[in-house]
């Protein structure tokens, strides 16, 4: 017995280690009551984490279950407090419960899709097959093996209709969301071709509905058959995309270099780039030749006659493109040679060879598409994938040529392009014997004069000394004659002619360079042009990468494998270990592919590569720079020590309308309207003034989604608008919201919302021959136009297959769509302002006013106009090719036929001529109502907009500066903004220098002289 200072005695029942705390009172940490030892020891005192507990109080903090004999200490987050938990709640708080059986994970477990599984339940819900670490799929919060996931639950690709096993792109289109394999989306986007099962020699895999009571025996297909077919398809898909996209990048790089060196007057580098392009085109032509062979020889007797006829029609339609492409290269070489002989006081303008560079990219694009399309059609006819693989194998060889093209071009300088028989030019298929070539018609026996079959060339011989062709019968009498004839296809002959032109041009340029010395000023001018071009190139790459970037989603996920090595479990029956501090220890395998997944979250966002579609944008940007040198003065005059980064003097804002928020766009409209009012171009007494003011902030309704705004609309007593069920004739805002798509057809870095029909039409037309005469002028087949219209109206979210139509038909359909819009794209409310702008004499002031009016356009109108103007500018580059070829539709002619569809007034809207009894439909006869004057002024406006489409898409710098000032003043309504702008205009502090014209630049083409927006006939 031990007596304490208070005179109380207690029984020493503690261990020797606890004798020192005998005199302390024991308070229960749970109920805060005194712990009194029971003399009969029916109740024990428990100690954990340095605290005492009644036995009845020693329970789990979460579920109140008794913890004796084992407990788990758990430290509360962001505190130093530790609580006692049972095993289940301890693992629950650590998120270590199996997602399937809801039991604590002990030992090995797996993490996938944000859930954890024990080893037993990390398996397929249907067949219980263990899910591999790299092969786990989830649907409806349940795991499945690859076989059952692909068979029953996987999304289907919009392009190929195969199940999506891993990566896919979600692409909103109208009210639907389409899923694509990234490669299928790329192939469709760049060449408008889909890889269906029948086009790659595989069977279609239908999506089955899972029924647990069906007793499915895992057949049709079996797991092995499905896996084998998916592997085959993925190989074909990956091969097709990688080879053709790589070819497009390489070809685009060559054409870009050709453009750069032509503008910077560098002949030798230009000829090197051209030689490299010809070698790559040679690979494409060889691939096309394999398709012709497979078409002629490999088709089975029972082939689908319709498919054969379609192939023949496609071959006929595309037959002229190789010659057009080679002609463009010949013209380029002619321009390049001209640089050495051109008068030093004269320069070759970009507009003079715009069609050459744009045409090169376009015809090469068309031939690539034709090759892919034909290969897939041949696959369908032969029920195999061999035609496609042969085509890709030849095209892939272009990657062997990286530089120094003339080490691969062995054509001698004295090579001839004439027939050895008639001495006439050979541009078609022919017969070759070493350096000699003959037309097919000239390939006759020199002895018996019989025609020799060009397809059987093993028997005929050639006498080199006498230069005689001998047939198989006559060659017996001439032992000196030897065989060796080869059949040369039309495509191979075109390449041969290009190589002759390359070698001869290079020889002339080398001699010219040896005799001419380049001056210091010429070198500086070349450096300046190269730096300017590189800046344009980088801008185009950056804009395209941002505009086309698409986020990738994953079906499959690599599971993370983990093992629990230690927990904080404590046993009350083992007092020797109660003082040990134990923590939760988990060992986790780091998945090797986690970095790879993160780097592929966005596709089509590479800023280091070019595509053929970028070429036309580069040409347009450089032409705009040539037309407006002051507005695009990015560099000061070069000094010897200057570098690129120190010379940038931006005259443009660099901000595109598509990048602005809705509120910023509304403020821009308010600023522009105030500036126009300040210039007295519009006043409060004008009939359109009220509608223009209301239009300034009108677009806020489109994006404002607060509860009270929605309630205000719902409670409105105004009658609801009729539900639009058709595309043609529907309001533009309704089309964009209901059947719109975020398109990359704009100029800026951000996708723009336009109707699906416009996106499909323009994308399809970019894959067609735009040099056909009368594009946008002819009306096409009226009956077919009505059929297409009815088809589109009946299914607005899915455009028909436009690849079966011709360019004339689609251009007429596009014109019909924009003509039938209830309001013209350039807005009825702005019509008078456009006409007033055209009447302004001073070019500087006219440009400023046009920029202001353009900024007033409603968002969807401007989006559609941006895509349309860019496309029309590109279309104009095919107006003239050579020898009276081409569409004849230059910018002026395009403006003439497009203007009545986008800038006009209807009967009801013409002042002093309201006739209530007449129908509102139909356009005004401009000559009768407006004496013809406004008609030509409207054409001049549209001509200007097409010519300067790149500039129009960008917010003027003076407007951006005023926008910043308005935002600093926190002005948010038209009245306050108008007052502020009036004050600024009175102070005359607005910088309009980007619109100044110091030196007019004249750009001449076949029919039109454009002088800074002025058209001289």
Curated annotation (Swiss-Prot):
Residues bearing the modification Phosphoserine: 562
Site (Arginine finger): 777
Domain of life of the native organism: Eukaryota
Domain Rho-GAP: 730-953
Molecular function GO terms recorded: GTPase activator activity; metal ion binding
Cellular localization per UniProt: Cytoplasm; Bud; Bud neck
Feature: compositional bias, Polar residues: 584-602
Gene Ontology terms describing biological process: actin cytoskeleton organization; cytogamy; negative regulation of Rho protein signal transduction; regulation of cell wall (1->3)-beta-D-glucan biosynthetic process; regulation of fungal-type cell wall organization; signal transduction; sporulation resulting in formation of a cellular spore
N-acetylmethionine carried by residues: 1
Record keywords, A-Z: Acetylation, Cytoplasm, GTPase activation, LIM domain, Metal-binding, Phosphoprotein, Repeat, Sporulation, Zinc
Recorded GO CC terms: cellular bud neck; cellular bud tip; cytoplasm; incipient cellular bud site; mating projection tip; mitochondrion; site of polarized growth
Any Pfam family: RhoGAP
LIM zinc-binding domain segment(s): 28-88, 98-148, 155-184, 419-474
Principal location class: cytoplasm
Biological role: Acts in signal transduction. Activates CDC42, RHO1 and RHO2. Negatively regulates 1,3-beta-glucan synthesis. May be responsible for the down-regulation of CDC42 during mating.
Subunit structure: Interacts with CDC42, RHO1 and RHO2.
Anything else known: Present with 468 molecules/cell in log phase SD medium.
Name under which the protein is recorded: Rho-GTPase-activating protein LRG1
Organism annotation: Saccharomyces cerevisiae (strain ATCC 204508 / S288c) (Baker's yeast)
């Amino acid at each position: 017995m031990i007596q304490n200072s208070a005179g109380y005695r207690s029984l020493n029942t503690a261990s020797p280690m606890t004798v020192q705390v005998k005199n302390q009172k024991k308070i229960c940490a749970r109920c805060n009551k005194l712990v009194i030892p029971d003399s009969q020891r029916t109740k024990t005192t428990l100690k954990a984490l340095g605290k005492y507990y009644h036995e009845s109080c020693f329970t789990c903090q979460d579920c109140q279950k008794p913890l004796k004999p084992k407990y788990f200490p758990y430290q509360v987050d962001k505190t130093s407090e530790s609580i006692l938990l049972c095993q289940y709640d301890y693992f629950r708080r650590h998120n270590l419960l199996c997602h399937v059986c809801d039991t604590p994970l002990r030992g090995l477990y797996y993490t996938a899709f944000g859930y954890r599984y024990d080893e037993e339940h990390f398996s397929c819900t249907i067949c219980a097959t263990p899910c591999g670490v790299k092969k786990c799929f989830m649907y409806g919060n349940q795991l499945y093996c690859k076989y059952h996931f692909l068979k029953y639950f996987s999304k289907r690709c919009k392009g190929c209709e195969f199940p999506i096993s891993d990566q896919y792109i979600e692409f909103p289109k109208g009210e639907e969301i389409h899923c694509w394999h990234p490669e299928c989306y790329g192939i469709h986007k760049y060449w408008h071709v889909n890889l269906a099962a029948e086009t790659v020699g595989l069977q279609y895999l239908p999506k089955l509905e899972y029924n647990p009571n069906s007793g499915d025996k895992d057949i049709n297909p079996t797991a092995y058959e499905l896996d084998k077919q998916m592997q085959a398809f993925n190989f074909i898909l990956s091969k097709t995309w990688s080879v053709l996209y790589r070819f497009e990048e390489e070809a685009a790089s060559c054409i870009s270099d050709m453009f750069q060196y032509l503008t910077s007057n560098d002949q030798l580098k230009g000829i090197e780039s051209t030689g490299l392009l010809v070698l790559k085109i040679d690979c494409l032509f060889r691939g096309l030749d394999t398709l012709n062979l497979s078409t002629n020889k490999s088709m089975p007797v029972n082939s689908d006659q319709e498919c054969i006829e379609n192939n023949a029609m496609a071959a006929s339609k595309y037959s002229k493109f190789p010659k057009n492409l080679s002609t463009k290269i010949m013209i380029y070489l002619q321009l390049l040679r001209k640089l050495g002989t051109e008068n030093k006081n004269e320069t070759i303008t970009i507009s003079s060879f715009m069609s050459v560079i744009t045409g090169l990219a376009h015809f090469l694009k068309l031939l690539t598409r034709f090759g892919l399309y034909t290969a897939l059609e041949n696959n369908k006819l032969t029920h195999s994938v061999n035609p496609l693989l042969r085509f890709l194998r030849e095209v892939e060889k272009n990657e062997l040529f990286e530089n120094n093209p003339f080490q691969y071009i062995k054509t001698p300088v004295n090579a001839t392009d004439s027939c050895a028989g008639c001495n006439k030019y050979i541009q078609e298929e022919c017969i070759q014997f070493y350096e000699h070539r003959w037309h097919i018609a000239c390939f006759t026996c020199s002895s018996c004069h019989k025609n020799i079959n060009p397809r059987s060339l093993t028997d005929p011989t050639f006498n080199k000394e006498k230069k005689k062709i001998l047939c198989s019968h006559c060659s017996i009498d001439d032992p000196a004659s030897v065989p060796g004839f080869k059949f040369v296809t039309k495509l191979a002959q075109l390449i041969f002619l290009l190589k002759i032109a390359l070698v001869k041009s290079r020889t002339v340029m080398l001699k010219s360079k040896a005799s001419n010395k380049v001056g210091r000023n010429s070198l500086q001018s070349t450096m300046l042009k190269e730096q300017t071009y590189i800046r344009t190139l980088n801008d185009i790459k950056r804009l395209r990468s941002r505009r086309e970037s698409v986020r990738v989603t994953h079906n499959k996920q690599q599971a993370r494998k983990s093992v629990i090595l230690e927990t904080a479990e404590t046993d009350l029956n083992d007092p020797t270990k109660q003082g040990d501090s134990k923590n939760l220890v988990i060992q986790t395998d780091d998945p090797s592919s986690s970095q790879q997944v993160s780097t592929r979250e966005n596709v089509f966002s590479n800023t280091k590569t070019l595509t053929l579609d970028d070429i036309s944008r580069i040409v347009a940007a450089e032409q705009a720079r040539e037309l407006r040198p002051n507005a695009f003065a990015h560099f000061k005059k070069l000094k010897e020590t200057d570098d690129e980064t120190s010379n940038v003097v931006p005259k443009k804002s660099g901000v595109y309308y598509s990048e602005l928020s809705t509120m910023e766009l509304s403020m821009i409209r308010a600023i522009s309207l105030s500036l126009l009012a300040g210039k007295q171009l519009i006043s409060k007494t004008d009939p359109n003034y009220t509608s223009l003011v209301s239009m300034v902030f009108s677009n806020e309704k489109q994006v404002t989604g607060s509860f009270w705004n929605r309630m205000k609309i719902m409670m409105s007593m105004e009658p609801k608008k009729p539900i639009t069920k058709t595309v043609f004739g529907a309001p533009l805002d309704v089309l964009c919201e209901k059947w719109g798509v975020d398109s990359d057809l704009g100029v800026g870095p951000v996708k723009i919302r336009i109707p699906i029909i416009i996106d499909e039409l323009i994308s399809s037309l970019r894959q067609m021959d735009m040099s056909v005469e009368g594009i946008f002028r002819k009306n096409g087949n009226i009956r077919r136009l009505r059929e297409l219209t009815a088809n589109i109206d009946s299914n607005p979210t899915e455009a028909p297959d436009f690849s079966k139509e011709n360019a004339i038909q689609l251009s007429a359909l596009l014109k019909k769509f924009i003509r039938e819009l209830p309001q013209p794209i350039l807005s009825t409310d702005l019509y008078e302002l456009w006409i007033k702008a055209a009447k302004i004499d001073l070019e500087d002031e006219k440009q400023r006013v046009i920029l202001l009016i353009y900024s007033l356009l409603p968002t969807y109108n401007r989006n559609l106009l941006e895509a349309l103007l860019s496309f029309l500018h590109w279309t104009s580059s095919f107006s003239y090719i050579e020898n009276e070829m081409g569409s004849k539709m230059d910018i002026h002619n395009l403006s003439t036929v497009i203007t009545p569809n986008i800038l006009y007034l209807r009967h009801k809207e013409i002042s002093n001529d309201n006739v209530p009894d007449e129908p509102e439909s139909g356009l005004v006869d401009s000559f009768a109502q407006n004496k013809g004057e406004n008609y030509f002024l409207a054409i001049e406006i549209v001509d200007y907009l097409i010519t300067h489409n790149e500039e129009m898409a960008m917010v003027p710098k003076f407007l951006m500066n005023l926008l910043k000032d308005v935002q600093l003043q926190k002005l948010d309504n038209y009245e306050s903004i108008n007052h502020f702008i009036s004050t600024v205009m009175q102070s005359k502090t607005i910088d309009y220098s980007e619109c100044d014209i110091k030196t007019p630049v004249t750009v001449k083409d076949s029919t039109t002289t454009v002088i800074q927006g002025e058209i001289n006939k």
